[in-house]
Swiss-Prot record:
Protein family: Belongs to the RimM family.
Primary localisation category: cytoplasm
Entry keyword set: Chaperone, Cytoplasm, Ribosome biogenesis, rRNA processing
Name of the gene: rimM
Record text about domains: The PRC barrel domain binds ribosomal protein uS19.
Localization per record: Cytoplasm
GO biological processes: ribosomal small subunit biogenesis; rRNA processing
Annotated protein name in UniProt: Ribosome maturation factor RimM
GO MF assignments: ribosome binding
Role of this protein: An accessory protein needed during the final step in the assembly of 30S ribosomal subunit, possibly for assembly of the head region. Essential for efficient processing of 16S rRNA. May be needed both before and after RbfA during the maturation of 16S rRNA. It has affinity for free ribosomal 30S subunits but not for 70S ribosomes.
InterPro entries linked: PRC_barrel-like_sf (IPR011033), PRC_RimM (IPR056792), RimM (IPR011961), RimM_N (IPR002676), RimM_N_sf (IPR036976), Transl_B-barrel_sf (IPR009000)
Domain PRC barrel: residue ranges: 98-175
Source organism of the structure: Pseudomonas paraeruginosa (strain DSM 24068 / PA7) (Pseudomonas aeruginosa (strain PA7))
The protein's assembly and partners: Binds ribosomal protein uS19.
């Protein structure tokens, strides 16, 4: 039985075909990249459409994955899978240590500085070489209408309260 859409988390995206035997090229959002291959049953989602897929095999190929899906044996048919997000139920994600969070848990949190000013909400995160970066967008009640990029580091992030939907940060509002 398919998992409800609000209980799914995106772990990758099919970006193109790979080879001539119906394999697809996948950009993985997992760390390490090939952890995505641990999940055999995928819910694929694109433009409001969902479909189920089963991973037969896959391998790391540079910074992407090459994946073979059950029943997908033709390059042209594989091309129709381009653009699908790869989702799994949240319940299948491994448990994290205290103080560790999945990105999806941080998205939507209100970001509040030390002075109690609402800077905005976390729209999404970016992976950079040095550290992850939170993209904080303005929202109702925020200090101004500026988008901010804040490092996801122990120096910047003071506390996270998922139940309250808040993150406290040490960040100058003028930045």
């Amino acid at each position: 039985m398919p998992t409800p859409a609000d209980d799914l988390v995106v772990i990758g995206k099919i970006v193109s075909v790979y080879g001539i035997r119906g394999e697809v090229k996948v950009y993985s959002f997992t760390d390490p990249l090939d952890n995505l291959l641990d999940y055999r049953r995928w819910t694929l989602r694109r433009d409001g459409e969902t479909r189920q897929a089963e991973l037969v095999r896959g391998r790391l190929h540079g910074k992407v994955l090459a994946a073979k899906l059950k029943g997908l044996d033709d390059r042209e048919e594989a091309r129709t899978f381009t653009g699908y997000e790869i989702c799994i139920p949240r319940s299948e994600l491994p448990s994290l240590e205290e103080g560790e969070y999945y990105w999806y848990q941080l998205e939507g949190l209100k970001v509040i500085d030390q002075g109690g000013q609402l800077l905005g909400v976390i729209d999404h995160l970016l992976e950079t070489g040095a550290n992850d970066v939170m993209v904080v967008k303005p929202c109702a009640g925020s200090l101004d209408d500026r988008e901010r990029l804040l490092p996801y580091t122990g120096q910047c992030v003071l506390s996270i309260d998922l139940a309250a939907g808040e993150m406290r940060v040490d960040w100058d509002a003028d930045f």
